[in-house]
């Protein structure tokens, strides 16, 4: 079989530029085979010194998903305080853990592994959102997580119930919802962050 590398590269790039953080989901379960695929993508991410200090809990049980939902702070920039309606909640979660909080590479590993999860989810048309405003003590308690593991973050997952749009960033990094409940996300322009051959002040 002839593999078109150009098409593969474009597919990867298109997946990257189409991915947005999703906070409203469809009430449709994700198959366990797909959830395992996401973890396998994380497993194969680069790891500082190849120490591989991350572990993951996959949660799709409805009762446990409800418990996790109650520990999460959602969309901090949106006022008044907002959270998804019951029918818009994530149908699965991934809890990201490290077994070595003192490892100097651990945060870099988390970034690499979680991006693999998000992009693989996007390729399956599954929305995702990394959440760090969480009640770690409560999550530890009802998921029976050992004290030797640090809970870094939670990734919410579900089939997309919204499609946020990108806006050119002007005066603020804060995202907002319009009157049609569409989420608008400011991003810095390419020309504002790229420097060719040397650093440019303008």
Description of each model-found segment:
Residues 1-202:
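Acidic, surface-exposed loops and disordered segments
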